[in-house]
Amino acid sequence: MGAAYIGLQLLEREKNIFLENPNIQPDLEGKDYIVERQLKPEARRDIVELLAEIGIKPNAMIDVSDGLASEIIHICEASNKGCKLYEDKIPLDSMTYETAREFGIDPTVCALNGGEDYELLFTVPQSDYDKIKEMKMSTTWSI
């Protein structure tokens, strides 16, 4: 989460540097993941397919296009429920985390308020909790 947002910050910084001095080329070395997340976002159809394969039917699902906080609010309002969000459980890849720190931005703020990640936020029945735990253990995805 937050990778597209921090990718945008990086691209904007490099654009400003280039506009001030056209002889300096953008420095995007080692930042492929976050740049790609900004320039080529992809919907996570693979997650939907995986959930179907293991027999999980989410009660609610939304893509994270406006930031995690906004999407959590949408699900809570639509279901007339609340939630607890644990900061240490928010999936942040290391490049997003490190680049946010380089920019002096709290990485959690990137995940909560950045957008265009197109990851999926979903809820499942409590009875499917063990299946989700097993799925998490068998994949490198953040669930």
Mark where each language-model region is:
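Short, acidic (Asp/Glu-rich) active-site segment that either coordinates a divalent metal cofactor
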Residues: 1-49
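Glycine-/charge-enriched secondary-structure boundary and capping motifs
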Residues: 53, 58-143
